Amino acid sequence: VDVDLKANTTKAENYRGSGNVYGQWDFLKHFQFKAMFSLDYASNSTRTYTPVIQVYDASVEGDIATLGNGKTGVSQAKETEMKVQSDYLLTYTNSWGDHSVTATAGFTTYYNKLENLNGARTQGVGLVIPDNPDKWYVSIGDAATATNGSTQWERSTVSVLARVLYNYK
């Protein structure tokens, strides 16, 4: 197998940005409010070339066998994903004598969205797709062999929380 044929057959661009910010406010001596926000965004795109690979096989006529369908091919995919979270917490803290109490209540939201689109084509009769990254797009090749797919979804959650801690001495 000429493994060099499979080398450098994918071009990819991947970008990602993420960050978070929070604010805190102490008020009325015993209260604290905190708000937190975070965002994570990713964008990925790939283009892949599939060459014709021939191998030595003594059991076939001519001693050379072709792996797969014997056609060159290209595929492309584009995916984006976004995750957003927000948290809001209110805390009351107080102590008197040998007693102390900390009470926390909160509200949290989470959102996740994914979109993926992909497609592929193989060569037509007499129209070999060249091993050239400038040609690795699904607009080349035999339109009758085109395949495509997609995935997309959105998910979200909302949560409420509460906790009370009491200490004596």
Where are the language model's segments positioned?
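Surface-exposed loop/turn segments flanking beta-strands in extracellular/periplasmic regions
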Residues: 1-3, 51-70, 115-147
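Outer-membrane beta-barrel transmembrane strands
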Residues: 2-48, 74-95, 102, 114-116, ...
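Flexible domain-boundary/linker segments
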Residues: 38-40, 52, 107, 122
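Extracellular low-complexity Ser/Thr/Asn/Gly-rich intrinsically disordered segments
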Residues: 68-70, 76, 106
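Extended hydrophobic secondary-structure segments that form protein cores and membrane-embedded regions
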Residues: 102-108
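Glycine-rich, aromatic-flanked loop segments that form ligand/cofactor-binding clefts
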Residues: 109-113
